[in-house]
Curated annotation (Swiss-Prot):
General function of this protein: Catalyzes the reversible transfer of the terminal phosphate group between ATP and AMP. Plays an important role in cellular energy homeostasis and in adenine nucleotide metabolism.
PANTHER family linked to this entry: NUCLEOTIDE KINASE
Catalyzed reaction equations: AMP + ATP = 2 ADP
Organism: Ralstonia nicotianae (strain ATCC BAA-1114 / GMI1000)
Enzymatic class: transferase
Region (LID): 122-159
Gene of this entry: adk
Its EC number(s): 2.7.4.3
Positions of AMP binding: 31, 36, 57-59, 85-88, 92, 156, 167
Entry protein name: Adenylate kinase
Pathway of action: Purine metabolism; AMP biosynthesis via salvage pathway; AMP from ADP: step 1/1
Subunit structure, as described in the record: Monomer.
C-alpha cells in the first residue's frame, strides 16, 4: 500500500494516517523528519540541505525528491508507505512522477472550510496537563476552566481563526490544485509517465473518528 493523503489543515489527516499505517504495516513519510535525519547523519544530500537552511533558504525540490528516493529504499518501506503533507505543490508532484516514485492510491479527506474553522478555532487547551477541550463538541464544565484544576484554558495561536484562515488560504492556492492533478491523472491514464497512475479516492471527513476511519478503509480496500 503506497499512498498520498490529501486534505486541508484540520481535516484529520494525522489521525487517519496513524490508523492506516497500523492497518497496513507501513511507515508515515515526513519530509521534515527526513531532512533532520539526513542533516544529522551527514549524508551528501543532508550536507547540501544544511548549507541551504543555514543560509536561510528553502530546500529545493530536487534535494527533497532525492531524500524521498533514499528513504523509500529502507527496509520498513517494503510493504509500502504513506505521504502526509507531501507533495504540497504541482512541481513536487511532477518531480515525484518523473523520479518514478510509485503510488497506488491518492486519498482525499474532504472537509468544508467552515467546518474546519469551527473545529480548530473552538479548541481550548490546559497547558500544564495537555488536556484539550472544544467550546462546542467537548466543553469544560465551567467555561474557560480546566475540569480537574480550575486553571484557565488557552487558545493556541495556531487555533486562532485568523491563523486558521491564513493556513487554509495557502492550502487553497498551493495544495488544492493537487486534487485536480491526481484525479485527472487517475482518470486519463499514464501518458509518458514512468509509473502507473494511482487510484483516486475521496471521502468525507465529517463525523466521528470511527466513521471516518471506516470510510478510509472502505475506499482503500474497494
Amino acid at each position: 500500500m503506497r499512498l498520498i493523503l490529501l486534505g486541508a489543515p484540520g481535516a484529520g489527516k494525522g489521525t487517519q494516517a496513524k490508523f492506516i499505517c497500523e492497518r497496513f504495516g507501513i511507515p508515515q513519510i515526513s519530509t521534515g523528519d527526513m531532512l533532520r535525519a539526513a542533516v544529522k547523519a551527514g549524508t551528501p544530500l543532508g550536507i547540501e540541505a544544511k548549507k541551504v537552511m543555514d543560509a536561510g533558504g528553502l530546500v529545493s525540490d530536487d534535494i527533497i525528491i532525492g531524500l524521498v528516493k533514499d528513504r523509500l529504499q529502507q527496509s520498513d518501506c517494503k510493504n509500502g508507505y504513506l505521504f502526509d503533507g507531501f507533495p504540497r505543490t504541482i512541481p513536487q508532484a511532477e518531480a515525484m512522477k518523473d523520479a518514478g516514485v510509485p503510488i497506488d492510491y491518492v486519498l482525499e479527506i474532504d472537509v468544508p472550510f467552515d467546518a474546519i474553522i469551527e473545529r480548530m478555532s473552538g479548541r481550548r487547551v490546559h497547558v500544564a496537563s495537555g488536556r484539550t477541550y472544544h467550546v462546542k463538541y467537548n466543553p469544560p464544565k465551567n467555561e474557560g476552566q480546566d475540569d480537574e484544576t480550575g486553571d484557565p484554558l488557552i487558545q493556541r495561536d495556531d487555533d486562532k481563526e485568523e491563523t486558521v484562515r491564513k493556513r487554509l488560504s495557502v492550502y487553497e492556492n498551493q495544495t488544492r490544485p493537487l486534487v485536480d492533478y491526481y484525479s485527472g491523472w487517475a482518470e486519463n491514464g499514464n501518458g509518458a509517465a514512468k509509473v502507473a497512475p494511482p487510484k483516486y479516492r475521496k471521502i468525507s471527513g465529517i463525523g466521528n473518528v470511527e466513521d471516518i476511519t471506516g470510510r478510509v478503509f472502505g475506499a482503500l480496500e474497494a
